[in-house]
């Protein structure tokens, strides 16, 4: 793995992408989300600080004045979430002036069983708090086994799920 957080630009969406910028180097990260809020750029990313490629447990916050900055500043309280049942990013959206972070919910022996939608209550370069407003579980009556991503940007809604099919 490259151990980088990379920003790509679509040259022919969704088929062709070009590397625009390496935002962070020498970091074991996954499921990074970058967004602008109150004239600052924020990065929420899952970092494995134990060097075991476990991206479930730690959510880290960084901020910068410019998206293309070479200086993403870590929040003093990093990791802002240290909890394997809550930390893993699973999507992001803004609605009615509110910001929402979606997290994966892991189940025993089941990666990405469900997701939770969390309203971000406070986000500054050194403060972060969120509260869970909804938990979304797979609809087992339809055969859905897992669902662990939801993202909405005003034009597109993206989510994933898996089904169990009888043989």
Spell out what each predicted region is:
Residues 1-167:
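Carbohydrate-active catalytic/glycan-binding domains of CAZyme proteins
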């Amino acid at each position: 793995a490259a151990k980088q957080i990379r920003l790509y630009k679509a040259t022919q969406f969704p088929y062709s992408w070009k590397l625009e910028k390496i935002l962070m180097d020498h970091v074991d990260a996954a499921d990074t989300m970058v967004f602008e809020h109150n004239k600052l750029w924020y990065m929420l990313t899952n970092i494995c600080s134990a060097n075991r490629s476990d991206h479930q447990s730690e959510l880290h916050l960084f901020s910068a004045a410019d998206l293309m900055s070479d200086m993403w500043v870590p929040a003093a309280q990093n990791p802002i979430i240290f909890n394997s049942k809550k930390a893993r990013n699973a999507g992001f959206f803004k609605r009615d002036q509110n910001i929402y972070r979606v997290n994966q919910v892991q189940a025993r022996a089941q990666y990405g069983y469900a997701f939770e939608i969390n309203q971000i209550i406070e986000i500054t370069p050194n403060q972060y708090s969120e509260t869970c407003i909804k938990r979304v579980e797979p609809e087992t009556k339809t055969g859905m086994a897992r669902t662990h991503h939801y993202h909405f940007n005003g034009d597109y809604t993206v989510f994933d799920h898996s089904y169990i099919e009888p043989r």
